[in-house]
Amino acid sequence: MSGHPAKDPFRIRDHVVEFDDIVAEIVRRSEETRANVPMVADVAYGADATETMDLFFPEGKRDRLPVHMFIHGGYWRMFSKRDYSYVAETVTNAGAIAVIVDYALMPTVRMARIVDQVRRAKRWVFDNVAHHGGNPGLLTVSGHSAGAHLATMLFDGDERPFGIKAALLLGGLYDLKPLQMSFLAAEIAITDEEARRFSPIDHSFDPSVGVDISVGADETPPFHSQAALFTDHLDTQGLTVSRTTLGGANHMSSVRDLGLAGTEAASLLARVVAA
């Protein structure tokens, strides 16, 4: 019997050797995207300094274009919209406006605040994106990890009108209770109330939304089990839901690939954008 403690399956750094290299790559690629893709930076959707979004545009005329929101992950406590600008490459190449959303981070704020922020970001898009050449009637969403969790909050039972046509949920967290026993207990201390209120596995959802639940083949077991449970949960509610296992991908390489043309993840994203 080994004397070494088991690795926490939620602590991604312990399971992805190239974690730091991938983070450095996506940050570098994001700066390239910001330099090369037409954009409007730091558009405010609220009064707080954290309540901003970046809009990226395809080349050419902007007239009632599809719109896609992306919500970044980081266990609600790290990263920013700037780190994920590269996702806009796939979205704009598919002919849509990319909206990369920022939000406040735990533990400085609690989860209720973050959920409220992303919902208000969606409402800003509904009310204002037409002024930027977008069609709010063609709105889709994606998110990775904690961002996938937050993306579900844009079409759950509390968020009416829904207005989301399709969603891509990548490496998502849909039952928050296991996280209370993970390394995150010392970092963000998810409360019993937060786990109860904000676990998507306990929510109802808009049955008109098409959802792809994706997970990397090399992710740790909880991400696979949560994907399976949430797929079944949505299916029982009548949503059109598919589940994709990304071959050879881990929690970090899968999100990196969202902005790399020709990868399975980027193809899934482009398909959702075109829904």
Language model: regions and residue ranges:
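Alpha/beta-hydrolase superfamily serine-hydrolase fold, recognizing
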Residues: 1-275
